[in-house]
Amino acid sequence: MLFTALIALLPFTMQAAEKQRDFTIGQNTFLLDGKPFVVKAAEVHYPRIPQAYWDHRIKMCKALGMNTLCLYVFWNIHEQAEGQFDFTGNNDVAAFCRLAQKNGMYVIVRPGPYVCAEWEMGGLPWWLLKKKDIRLREQDSYFMERVKIFEEKVAEQLASLTIQNGGPIIMVQVENEYGSYGEDKAYVSEIRDVLKANWYKKNSKGELVGPALFQCDWSSNFTKNGLDDLVWTMNFGTGANIDQQFKRLGELRPDAPKMCSEFWSGWFDKWGARHETRPAKDMVAGIDEMLSKGISFSLYMTHGGTSFGHWAGANSPGFAPDVTSYDYDAPINEWGLATPKFYELRKTMEKYNDGKKMPAVPKAPMGIITVPTFRLTEYVPILFGFDKMEEGKLKTFEEMNMGWGSMMYSCTLPEIPTSSTLSADIHDFGQVFINGQYIGKIDRVKNEKTLTLPAVKKGARLDILVEGMGRINFGRAIKDFKGIVGDLTLTAEYNNAEYTIKPQKWLNTTIPDDYETAVKALRTGSTKNLAKNHNDLTTKPGYYRGYFNLKKVGDTFLNFEKWGKGQVYVNGHAMGRIWSIGPQQTLYVPGCWLKKGQNEVIVLDVVGPRETVVWGQDTPELNKLQLEKSNKHNNIGDKPDLNSMTPAAKGTFKSGNGWQTISFSSAAKGRFLAIECTSLHDGSDVAAIAELYVQGTNGKRLSRETWTTKYADSEEDNGNHTGDKVYDLQESTYWQTVKGSGFPHLLVIDLGSEQTIKALEYLPRAEQGAPGSIKDFKIFVY
């Protein structure tokens, strides 16, 4: 009887086992196994979360009502040296995807090769730059050769995990926001073909099957590179006019499903500016609207985590390196706990959970602990961390085969009887010494390129210590060499003549950024014990080490506000960058990387601390600035006298969202661009501009790489709405004036050199109604 029952069940069992699952594109909807499916995705990044906490973070996303995880695959963390791949431990992306499936989640994979993500060089490996003439994100033969190898390795890890193979992966992205980089359908097509070749396989019927391929971009540029056979998705932020964002897509593809592939829950922080936040109500309202209309989304970020070690990137134009924390003001905070944003969103998500009960919010894997103040008592000078020395011309990090760290550049000088001006393109933070005496710094963040040196005698030694920060991750400037880039010159006037000196004989010394180098330096150097009152030793660049003891482990936030600038290692783990200017003053230290008993802390401080003390807090400090001077651009001496000038154009902007172009009656020539606003469409006095471009006489946009803000009559810096936001390549950020500051409002841009301009392009805020949009204006070029 039992045997007969088993035989009866066998055909059904075999049929079920053979039935292939699928994710396809239907009319106005995605189809999961043939049924309409709305993607509710949580963006999370496996390298930004300790592996021991992966399961907890995935469960947190599920408890928020998400059904999918969206993740980038970071090329440069998997291939840190050319040809050497690592998919183990915290880099085991396949294990992360399997864990997602175990928790009942689907997965969207975004394998680049470029990913942005406020990550070093946008995920591209630094060693690509050893080929100085490489064309990144183009059909450069070497670039594409390495891309194909990388994508093949990724597919070896993940292609067996597609939904057609019984795994969780339903979609794979082709490149990433390419419309913000350029227009090159041939390149994007080749990336698509590479992914198809690795992810698509023939089924039993001989049909090629694989995950749905899609490309994401902004509503303002997605048509530049849109391929006919790919799904098109939009990226935009909270508060955006959602109907407007999908309007053009609906016109071009009226039957296509709609998806916001990056709905920005917050924003990233940069060194020297305040911590970014975004209102919960705008995020919740946007998701509610999308779900009510059947629009799929991925919430970027749902949990941001931490850019440990040297992995934080930088934005451009205007070099703006990102802090270590990637909290992002996301619903799940940096250390994995639910925020008020989380619970507000959870209430809304419950409405769209098919009547099912929401999963419980999981308990944190570890509690939060504090650590009493302790002192780092060992010290060796920074040069004990040297790796290689080469004599000759100036060399970049890449030419010295070093990805991350610092370099010391040294030479001897001829006699210069008067003060001189040192000029160099330093990437990124340079400190200048003569005969061991500190002279000053050149900081790329402040767009500094020169420094005045005192008179020197023949044979004086010039040392320049250059720390490289994260490589630019967005825009054309991602080809970001580190060190002294190009020539260094000294100019001086004496004996009624101007002299230019270009030292040619340099000693290039590399100081890599890694734990092994730090340990070697402390072992081989003549370690000095820093007594409590010997703070004369704590003002020097070097390696510092100390210890703290624990009876119980837990997550904590180590405070480094007394320190200068550099990197921190705890028990061998690279925790990230510190910089006294803030806003981040603490580093998140996961309890899974701590231990009972003695714990080691090493700080590589390239500046030197004010005091060698550290303590552990139970809350982070992400919004404490310690600046030498304000970030505002309101020096009255920089304000131009517009009364004596004739405007290049004047008139009235249209109301509403979207780009507008103002053509000049005749070309205007000048180095400075001023836009004066005398009224707004919404009747308020709070003006805002999201982005500005200028066009040359050929009608094409001119580069903004050299732009800086000269003057702004008013800037709302509490929300980081400073003048530099109008050329930061981000349509969701904006310059905004302070309420009550009064008309006229004025913003002046230094273009970097004299330009001939025929038109100005203006973008108001992306939110519905375009709050703060300018009505009456005058444009000056001088």
Per-range role (PLM):
Residues A16-T68, R98, V553:
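N-terminal carbohydrate-binding accessory modules
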Residues W54-E120, R192-K196:
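Aromatic-lined substrate-binding rim segments of carbohydrate-active enzymes
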Residues G83-N91, K102, P113-E138, V188-D193, ...:
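Aromatic- and acidic-residue-enriched segments that line the glycan-binding/catalytic groove
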Residues F143-L227:
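Active-site neighborhood of glycoside hydrolase catalytic domains
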Residues N198, G239-N333, L337:
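Catalytic-core region of carbohydrate-active enzymes that cleave or remodel glycosidic bonds
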Residues S419-F433, L462, F548-N571, I578-W579, ...:
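Aromatic-lined ligand-binding clefts that engage carbohydrates, nucleic acids, or primary amines
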Residues I464-G470, V603-P609, E676-G683:
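Short beta-strand-plus-loop segments that form exposed binding edges in beta-rich domains
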Residues M575, D638-S644, F653-T709, D713-Y782:
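Aromatic, loop-rich ligand-recognition surfaces of beta-strand-rich domains
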